[in-house]
Amino acid sequence: MSSELMFNYTFSWPAGPKDVILTGTFDDWRGTLPLVKTAKGNFEITMPVKLANKDDTFQFKFIVDGVWCVSDSYKKEHVSEGIENNFLQITDLVETQEVAGASRIPEAGGLLCGKPPRSAGPPSTSNRKKNKRNNKKRRSKLKKKSTKNNKNSNESLDDNEEEDGVTGTTTEDVTGTSREETPLAEPTNVSKEAPGNFHILPIDQSADTTQSNGIIGGPGPVLVPNPGEIKEFTEIRDVDARELNERLNKKEEVPEPVAGPIVESSVTEKSPALPQADDPIVETKEMAHNVQELTPQVEAVTPLINEPEPLPTPEAQISIPESSKVEPVEGSLQSKLVEKRESTEGVLDGSKKVENKAKKDEEVFTLDPIVNKAPKLPLTDEQTAEGRKSPAVSEEKEKKKKQEKGSKEVKRSETSKEKKPSAKEVKKQTVKASKKQTASPLSSSTEEPKKKKTGFFGKLKKLFK
C-alpha cells in the first residue's frame, strides 16, 4: 500500500479582484487552476491535496490580477531570500474534513457535489406504520375541532334570534366576515425594494406619455400643431352633384375630319387650282370654254396604218342595243363544229393506236429465226390525212397484212416438216447438252460461237439468208 495521504481542502480569497489563480507544487508553479467566483463575490475552489507522509507540507501561492501574492489567512514560510509561500500541514487538513464518502466533481477542481444517495432497497415497514398512526391522530383531532365549531355556531345563532324577537328587529344586518374585515395591503414602491429586485424596462409616468401620439399609424388621432395654416381645414366649397355629373358625363361632339383630294403619283403636270367659293363665276366659265376647245383635237386623231381592229368582247356584244340590226353568226357555229370533229377524230385515232398495240402484243412468238425486215418509214402528213379520210383503204391494208402473215406461217411449217432431224442428230444434240452441263463456265463461254455455227438453228439461218 502506498503511504500517500489524500485530503479535500477548500482554498478561498476575499472579494475584490477580478481573477484569482491558485498555483503551487501540484502544477509545478504554472498557474493552471483558477478560483471560482461565488454569489457573495469571494473566490473559492475545493481540490484534493496529496501528502507523501505525515511530516510533508503542501506549498501554494495565489496570482491575483496577474500579481503573485501570499494570503495572510494561511501559514507562511520563507524558502529563500525574498521568496515567501503559503503551506498546509496534516493537522490543518484533518480539522477541515467533512463526512467521508461525499462525491467530488473532477471538472470543477474537486468541488463537493453532496452526500451519496442511500443504497437502493425496499422501504422499511416501521416507517410506514409510524406515518399511518400519525395521520390517524391528525384526522381525529381535526374532526373534534370541526364538531366543536359547529356546536358553537348553532348556539350563537339561537341567541341572536331570541334577541331579535324581543327588540322587534330583523337579522338583515350581519357582521362582516374575516376577509372583509382584514385591511388591504399597502402597495409597495418598486424603488424602495431591495437592490437585487429591479425592472427590466423603466416606467416613466410623465405628461408626455399621456398625450396622444402624433405619428401617422400610431394610436390615437393625429394632432397637427398648426391647423390654421392648412387650407383643407378652412376652405369649404359648395358643389351641386347633379351639375357636376352632367358636366363630366357630357359627351363632347368631335368634328369628323374632312377628306382632302387624293393626288396620284403618276401625274407630273400641275393641275390648275380649283375655284374657291369667294372667286367670281367668270373664271369657271373660262375653264369650261378651254375644256370644250380641247375635245375636238382629241377626236381629230387619225388611226394608224395596218392597225388590227379590236375584237368584240362578250361584254361589248351584250352592250349592243336591241334596236340595231344583228347579222346571223355563222362563222362561230362553224368553228364550234370543227372543234367537235377534231376532238372526235383524236379519240378515234387514240382508240386505233390502242388496238394496234394489242395486236402487236397478240403476235405468236415461235422458235423460228427472225428474218430481217426493212424498217417502216414514218407516215407523212398526207398519208395520215388520207387514212383519216378513207377508213375503207385502211381496212384493205390490214386484210393484206393478215394474208401475208398467214402465207409466211405456212411456208415456215413446210420447211420445218421437210427438215426434221434424224435419230442420230437427236442423240448428238443430247450428248452435247450433257457436256454443256458438266463443262466449266470458262470453257462454255469459249465454245458458244462454234456451237452457233454448227447448230440446227444456224443451218436454218443460212437457208433464210
Swiss-Prot record:
Give a yes or no for keyword DNA-binding in this entry. yes
Which residue ranges have biased composition labelled Basic and acidic residues? 337-363, 385-398, 404-428
Top-level taxon in the UniProt lineage: Eukaryota
Which positions carry Phosphothreonine?
T182, T295, T366
Which Gene Ontology terms of cellular component type are present? cytoplasm; nucleotide-activated protein kinase complex; nucleus
Region named X-DNA-binding: 160-161
Arranged from A to Z, the UniProt key words for this protein are: DNA-binding, Phosphoprotein
Q: Where is the composition biased (Low complexity)?
A: 166-177
Tell me how the protein is altered or processed after translation: Cleaved in the vicinity of position 160 to give an X-DNA-binding N-terminal subpeptide and a non-DNA-binding C-terminal subpeptide.
Mind listing the GO biological process terms from this record?
Answer: signal transduction
Q: Which InterPro entries match?
A: AMPK1_CBM, CRP1_MDG1_kinase, Ig-like_fold, Ig_E-set
Q: Which stretches of sequence are listed as region Disordered?
A: 107-227, 247-275, 305-465
Residue ranges annotated as compositionally biased, kind Basic residues, are 127-148, 451-465
In the record, what terms sit under GO molecular function? DNA binding; protein kinase binding
Indicate, by first and last residue, each region the UniProt record lists as having compositional bias (Acidic residues). Answer: 156-165
List residues modified as Phosphoserine. Answer: S153, S156, S271, S319, S343, S394, S440
- Family note: Belongs to the CRP1/MDG1 family.
Its annotated function is as follows: Cruciform DNA-binding protein which exerts an enhancing effect on the cleavage of cruciform DNA (X-DNA) by endonuclease VII from bacteriophage T4.
Please report the name of this protein according to its UniProt entry. Cruciform DNA-recognizing protein 1
Q: Which organism is it from?
A: Saccharomyces cerevisiae (strain JAY291) (Baker's yeast)
Ranked from the top, the taxonomy reads: Eukaryota, Fungi, Dikarya, Ascomycota, Saccharomycotina
The primary gene name is CRP1
